[in-house]
From Swiss-Prot:
GO terms for biological process: mRNA splicing, via spliceosome. It is found in: Nucleus. Residues 24-33, 215-224 have a biased composition (Pro residues). The keyword NADP does not apply. Residues 1-46, 203-234, 350-406, 478-503, 549-574 are annotated as: Disordered. This is Pre-mRNA-processing protein 45. The gene is PRP45. It comes from Cryptococcus neoformans var. neoformans serotype D (strain JEC21 / ATCC MYA-565).
Length: 574
């Protein structure tokens, strides 16, 4: 190896191993700060950088399009970009040129109305409107012809039916040589083959039957627990109540209340009562108790103040009465002063101390009598005040009542029945025992319990209301005098008289009942006669038993009277 190295010439260029340096990292712009999982409440990803190359965030309930997947591309809008001309003015004619074919010219300015000969911005070559050459005319004509043919062929193809099968109507000639070489040599024949014409309206010759579906694959085996019977609790949990409407009941069935409530679904959820209701009720109770205690204390204080005021007023009245008595008795002013001082010190009168040595027992008795009279007068005044207060309260209630209620109260007070009359200022007469007994009933025989003997049958022997006056009073319609006058006094004669005065004869019947023309006028009630049936032996037969038995004995023999009766019944039925 060393000899080989010496034999080789020296290298012209020395090779040095160069190590490529690692490229410096390019400065990257920091991306958006994405919130961590669990802290994305209220955050909405809007740009593609928010997804960080991944998918959507399921915890953010907004429309998300990662990598623009599912995002609908917006079509070309109709909004025009603002354009200006070489002078910096806005080109409003861009609106008129929008949507036109390229190359079309729209006259949208005033200079388009000026003739070309008078315009300064048009060159001489543009003014000279040269005719097109023959080549351009031919090209335009060919382009127009092709466009018209395209439109025409499109309409023709639309009218022609599609998918029409092509029929090969050409005949086919076949040279046929029989294979059997019999005694008589077979001759070659030429056969002409053509397609048979088919009737397009011929029904199908063969019926296509659908192959029945094969058996399904057996289900895969699934390991499951053996079936077990449902318990009563399971049946109750799985029970679905029938649907019962709260508005319709066309059949009119009577549905129990528990079934109606079961269909409402109220028992499916447990009712949880908030504890704040109890706290609220307790606070209300405590507040009510405090308020009642305050009201009670305030009432006691007011009562105590009223009692003190009443005591002071009574003391003042007592002093005034005592001073008046002293003035009437003619005592001196010094004595009155001492009496006032003694009364101010509230010394009782029972101590026996006389007023200045001038008092006596007779004077104390007079004072006690006057005090009793004053108390009686005060009591009477209090009673009068209470009555007046009640009257004022009643008047106040009457004023607050409605008109209807006030009228009822007034009518009730006006129609009150006062059964006792009191003569004021007179002594009450004492009721004597003689007025309590009726002397007309003395020495009279009492009636029996049944008012008659048990074997007598004379209860209806006499009319109930004997006399025309009683009957007229009973059968007269009740009413005011005005009604009596309008209906002829309520009597039959008055009614007939009023009907006879009828101008249009509306109240008179043109035809009455048969057999009632000769009946005389009747006063009072209708009087009936007792129908007594007499038997053959002359005894009374009230129920017709003897007559019935007699007809039964005769049997089927009918008399002429029976035939007449039957004939009358038939005529009446017909």
């Amino acid at each position: 190896m060393a000899a080989l190295t010496r034999a080789l010439p020296a290298p012209l260029h020395t090779s040095t191993t160069e190590y490529e340096e690692a490229p410096a990292p390019l400065p990257t712009t920091p991306g958006p700060q994405l919130p961590k999982y669990g802290q994305r409440k209220g955050w909405k990803p809007k740009t593609a950088a928010d997804f960080n190359g991944g998918g959507a965030y399921p915890e953010c309930h907004v429309a998300q399009y990662p990598l623009d997947m599912g995002k609908k591309n917006k079509g070309q809008g109709s909004t025009l970009a603002l354009q200006v001309d070489q002078d910096g003015l806005v080109r409003y004619d861009a609106i008129a040129q929008h949507g036109r074919a390229p190359g079309s010219r729209v006259q949208s300015s005033f200079k388009d109305l000026v003739p070309l000969a008078n315009r300064t911005d048009v060159t001489e070559s543009e003014r000279q409107m040269e005719r097109p050459d023959d080549l351009s005319v031919a090209e335009t004509a060919e382009r127009t012809r092709l466009a018209l043919e395209r439109i025409t062929h499109g309409k023709i193809k639309a009218a022609q039916p599609k998918h029409v099968p092509k029929t090969n109507s050409d005949a086919t000639y076949i040279r046929y040589t029989p294979a059997n070489q019999s005694a008589d040599e077979g001759k070659q024949r030429i056969i002409k083959m053509t397609e048979v014409q088919e009737d397009p309206l011929e029904p199908p010759r063969f019926k296509h039957k659908k192959i029945p579906r094969g058996p399904a694959e057996p289900p895969p085996p699934v390991l499951q627990s053996p079936p077990r019977a449902a318990t009563a609790q399971d049946q109750k949990d799985w029970m679905i109540p029938p649907c019962i409407s709260n508005w319709k009941n066309n059949k009119g069935y009577t549905i129990p209340l528990d079934k109606r409530l079961a269909a409402d679904g109220r028992g499916l959820q447990d009712v949880h009562i908030n504890d704040n209701f109890a706290k609220f009720s307790e606070s209300l109770y405590i507040a009510d108790r405090h308020i009642r205690e305050e009201v009670r204390a305030r009432a006691q204080l007011q009562q105590l103040l009223a009692q003190k005021q009443k005591t002071s007023k009574e003391e003042e009245l007592r002093l005034l009465a005592q001073r008046a008595r002293e003035d009437r008795s003619g005592l001196s002013s010094s004595v009155s002063g001492s009496v006032a001082a003694a009364s101010a010190s509230r010394l009782p009168a029972e101590t026996g101390i006389n007023l200045g040595g001038y008092g006596s027992e007779s004077g104390s008795e007079e004072e006690s009598d006057e005090e009793e009279e004053d108390e009686e007068a005060i009591r009477e005044r209090n009673i009068v005040r209470e009555e007046k207060r009640r009257e004022r309260e009643k008047e106040m209630r009457m004023s607050n009542m409605g008109s209807e209620m006030r009228a009822k109260m007034l009518a009730k007070e006006a129609n009150r029945d006062i059964s006792e009359k009191i003569a004021l200022g007179l002594a009450k007469p004492s009721a004597s025992k003689e007025t309590l007994l009726d002397s007309r009933l003395f020495n009279r025989e009492a009636l029996s319990t049944g008012f008659a003997s048990e074997d007598s049958y004379n209860l209806y022997d006499k009319p109930l209301f004997a006399g025309s006056s009683a009957a007229a009073a009973i059968y007269r319609p009740a009413g005011s005098s005005r009604n009596d006058e309008s209906f002829g006094g309520g009597t039959e004669e008055g009614i007939k008289e009023e009907m006879s005065k009828d101008r249009f004869q509306l109240g008179n019947a043109t035809r009455g009942f048969e057999g009632a023309e000769g009946v005389e006028a009747r006063e009072g009630p209708v009087q009936f006669e007792k129908d007594t049936i007499v038997a053959l032996d002359g005894s009374a037969d009230p129920f017709g038993v003897e007559q019935f038995m007699d007809a039964a004995r005769r049997g089927g023999k009918r008399t002429a009277e029976d035939r007449d009766e039957e004939r009358r019944k038939r005529a009446r039925d017909e």
